[in-house]
Amino acid sequence: MMSAPYASASGPAAATAFLTGAAGALPSRTVAVLEAIKRAILAGELKPGQALVEADLAEVLGVSKTPVREALKTLAGAGLVSMSPYKGAAVRVVDHEQARNLYDARLLIEPEALARAVAAGHDWRPAHQALQRADQAADQAERSLANRDFHRELYAGCGNPLLIHMLDDLRDQTALVSAAASCSQGGVRA
């Protein structure tokens, strides 16, 4: 069911279960498509610079082009996808300066959010569970996703939804840098 350029490491059955909501409440199609594409980008399954063809993604994910188009727009707004007139969408290619700027911003903001979460008495059990998932991960993609969850849990209790949203975007963009760095094609450019 999944074609080669968009194949998921977790396979067609997992993608189908995710899209149909078999594992829980039925998410909107756009949210499901958004999460599936984001996961593939951050896991390095979709490489930096790789074209994201709406029709192909729609076929692979078993949806119409509309939720794919909306998901790509949202991912472009989050800095994971670049949109070009007449060329369409592609996985964003990050240069070294952008990578440094992303990590710099995250290093400035995340410690403050963590300090606020500590002051608020945040429940650290989900962070601990994410660390355990990272330790037990079967592959690098699974470990990376658990690590992202761990970092999110560190700042999730800061009490400021805007700060959480900003850090979520920075976290995703730095994960893109990590995925790009691990690609043999060299998705981080000088």
Segments predicted by a language model, with ranges:
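C-terminal all-alpha effector/ligand-binding and dimerization domain
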Residues: M2-A14, A25, Q129-R133, A179-A190
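Short linear motifs at protein or domain termini
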Residues: M1-A119
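Flexible, glycine- and charge-enriched loops at secondary-structure boundaries
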Residues: T30, Q140, V188
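Amphipathic, non-membrane alpha-helical segments in soluble helical-bundle scaffolds
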Residues: R69, H96-Y103, W124, N160, ...
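Conserved amphipathic alpha-helical segments that form helical-bundle/coiled-coil interaction surfaces
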Residues: A119-S184
